[in-house]
């Protein structure tokens, strides 16, 4: 029984390390408020959240997506790998949406620390930061599935 617990502990450490390593390979980490139930999210789901096609979590709480400033390397990588467009193309899309009166883009934070603080204080928030950004209590990373 004790060896099974030891094996499970080792496995948990390996899986956690692999999850963080894969996030670092991406260059960004998706973060949510600790009160959020989310443990993993697909790139398709992220796309819908950040393009505001999904506006509520399954709990009914409003989704509040927050982007990094447009000149951030993590934002460019997020835009390319999740949205499938460059940051400039995403901004052009949102300008068209705003002009036509169909919506507004996610809030844009000036720094990674601002994203972390916003997500920590906003229960329905989801954001992303570079993989090297330290996370604080009240915020946790979620695994991104392809």
Name each model-derived stretch.
Residues 1-5:
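Positively charged n-region of N-terminal signal peptides that target proteins for export
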Residues 7-16:
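Bacterial N-terminal signal peptides
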Residues 18-23:
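Sec/Tat signal peptide C-region and signal peptidase I cleavage site
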Residues 24-146:
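Exported/periplasmic ABC-transporter solute-binding proteins
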């Amino acid at each position: 029984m004790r060896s099974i617990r030891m094996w499970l502990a080792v496995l948990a450490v390996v899986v956690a390390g692999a999850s963080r390593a894969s996030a670092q390979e991406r260059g960004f980490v998706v973060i949510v408020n600790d009160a959020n139930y989310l443990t993993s999210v697909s790139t398709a789901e992220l796309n819908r959240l950040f393009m505001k096609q999904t506006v509520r979590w399954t709990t009914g709480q409003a989704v509040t997506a927050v982007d990094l400033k447009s000149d951030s390397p993590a934002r460019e990588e997020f835009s390319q790998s999740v949205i499938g467009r460059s940051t400039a193309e995403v901004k052009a899309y949102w300008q068209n949406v705003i002009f036509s009166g169909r919506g507004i883009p996610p809030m844009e934070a000036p720094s990674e620390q601002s994203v972390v603080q916003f997500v920590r204080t906003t229960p329905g928030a989801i954001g992303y930061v570079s993989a090297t950004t330290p996370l604080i209590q009240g915020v946790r990373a979620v695994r991104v599935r392809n």
